[in-house]
């Protein structure tokens, strides 16, 4: 199992970028689910 993570494909830039963007999107979605109005502040 650890041999899979040591290959060059998993460490390549598109895979790392896809994992990073998915993680960031998940964090933003969950934050917006628990605190719905904190991401978009009104201009008042």
Curated annotation (Swiss-Prot):
Primary site of residence: membrane
Annotated membrane topology: Single-pass membrane protein
SUPFAM superfamilies registered for this protein in UniProt: Subunit IX of photosystem I reaction centre, PsaJ
Top-level taxon: Bacteria
Record GO biological process: photosynthesis
Keywords from the named record: Membrane, Photosynthesis, Photosystem I, Thylakoid, Transmembrane, Transmembrane helix
TM annotation in the entry: 9-29
Gene3D superfamilies per the UniProt record, alphabetical: Single helix bin
InterPro entries on file: PSI_PsaJ, PSI_PsaJ_sf
Any one Gene Ontology cellular component term annotated for this protein: plasma membrane-derived thylakoid membrane
Localization: Cellular thylakoid membrane
A Pfam family matched in the record: PSI_PsaJ
Function: May help in the organization of the PsaE and PsaF subunits.
Stated family: Belongs to the PsaJ family.
Cross-referenced PANTHER family: PHOTOSYSTEM I REACTION CENTER SUBUNIT IX, PTHR36082
Name of the protein described by the UniProt record: Photosystem I reaction center subunit IX
């Amino acid at each position: 199992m650890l041999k899979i993570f040591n290959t060059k494909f998993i460490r390549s830039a598109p895979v790392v970028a896809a994992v990073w963007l998915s993680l960031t999107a998940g964090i933003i979605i969950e934050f917006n689910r628990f605190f719905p109005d904190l991401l978009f502040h009104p201009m008042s």
